[in-house]
Amino acid sequence: MIKTATVAMFGLLLVATGASARHRRSSDAEPGVFDYYLLSLSWSPAFCLSDPGAAECNGPRRFGFIVHGLWPQNESGWPENCNVHQPVPDTVVSGISDIMPARGLVYHEWSAHGTCSGLGVADYFALVRSAYGRINIPASLSGPQQAVEQPPAAILAAFMRANPKLSPASTVVSCSGQGAPRLREVHICLDRSLNPRNCSADAARGQCRAASLIVPPIR
């Protein structure tokens, strides 16, 4: 289902915002037993507006979409915090930092979700990179230099043009904020071979219902 300072706080804030949109959580989950994956792409400029002191918001690189996580999902509910105890090596953290730029986020995603994948640490984050690499970011969202207001359907359409195998049933645009909501994340449902598939009803509930949203620029 759909989830959502210091480097560590990056992961905690994303988890807090995402979890509010999720529903039934599985307990006592067995690693590797799940139905599909959800790739969560977070729009970093929106995060940086809410937490400008975060490390990834003040470095030399400005990010657009980053990977929030690759989450094992079930048709109803989702596994989390499986009983796997394997530390994340520094080499894995540095190796994935171009798409997951916060150490705390990497640690959290492994502990909460990677442990339920049935994979080891290195293989899980290799799968994260592979999933991200299969998605083409629309040109209009690759480096916008000014804020754009548009309906969520326009963002969905842009992703489908850039990725013809995606559909409205496999892709969810989420937003957050009062008044004029901001683009928060794009969630893409993938089968266990990383091919697009329909999202479950729980995952689809995260769809932004606003008439329009703001896409903050990359600065």
Identify the function of each model-found stretch.
Residues 8-14:
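Bacterial N-terminal signal peptides
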